[in-house]
Amino acid sequence: MPPGWEWGEGMDENLVLKNRLREARAERGLSQAGLAELVGVSRNTIRSIETGQFNPTAKLALVLCIALDKKFEDLFYF
């Protein structure tokens, strides 16, 4: 950590994590419901992530990456 740097310094707590979830899901031929069942969440959760209304937890983001065979940086960005 750089000297004098504090965790969260200069970070916007309202920053939206953008994603390519819809595209990755389509590449796999999965519906929102199909992906939701695969990763153990509701279809509404998948929809909310795809539309940017909800940021997934680190655990859910990792599970989505595994389910869609994508690296984190290929699926999520700022």
Where do the language-model regions lie?
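Short alpha-helical DNA-recognition segment
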Residues: 29-48
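Phosphate-coordinating loops and pocket residues in cytosolic domains that bind phosphorylated ligands
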Residues: 48, 77-78
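Short, conserved catalytic or interaction motifs in soluble domains
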Residues: 51
